[in-house]
Amino acid sequence: MSEKYEFIDAEYATTSAGGSAPTVVQMCGWLGVSKSGFYEWRSRPESETARRRELLKIKIKALFEFNDEEYGYRRVHQALVRGGGQASDETVRRLMRELGLVPCQPKPWRRSLTEQDGQAGPIPDLVNRDFTANVPGEKMVGDITYVPTWQGWAFLATVIDCATRKVIGWAVDDNYRTPLITSAIQMAAQNVDLSADAIFHSDRGSNYTSAEFAAVLDGLGIRQSVGRTGSCFDNALAESFNAAVKVERVHRTVYPTIRKARENIARYIELRYNRTRLHSALGYRTPQEVHDEYLNRQRAA
């Protein structure tokens, strides 16, 4: 019974400001409890359950703020469990709503940087939307996204490992010509041991399909793969990272210079995204944890 009263109390507290919010009488009727019983329950001294609930709210708010207000209720719930807390994801959802904790939201507009090179030769799609891999360095994806600064556009190129979802290569510059993506893939090659048949997948942008970049990949022993023109799903993993960095960092930060943008994005990638941000596709682990688990298995073998 007390759970129903707690639900009514929480719902009324979070919706009473709205003109169309249900009344206490309506909610009591829906849940099959009496109005008098609800108010009698509400007037009792604070119970141990209520104290635990308030403590849980404090923990949830602390986790939400510690993670830069990026997490929805599922990630907050997983972070709570990892820290030894106990609560259902639905309880976390309800308490976050009561506390008014809303994660940062994406903006609808997106500028495309894909400019197809009409002179590019045929390059196969070796990935076919399968963004999984058995070991780090086997399959990688990359893309470029833009970052506004007071000095004009900055451009971020990334390389993501499909096995760990870790950003293993990145570069920021004031243009998105081929040297930008070359820097990113060279960093990636330094950060992981590439498989003998390693694949790098991208869209059909003119820089990715250029002869200059093809020569770089060939020199690193990497097979090239590209998706179809105009299909974001063919490079969905890279697009997903772009959305995350935009929502969680770029859209919430003002960059006076390209240098400041580079420094801030570097911190996000190396300290936040790779090492502390829980990834749903990894069972709510971090990319670095998955990478380290692979290395530990290799050492034990």
Predicted segments with their positions:
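Charged DNA-binding/catalytic regions of mobile-element recombinases
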Residues: 1-301
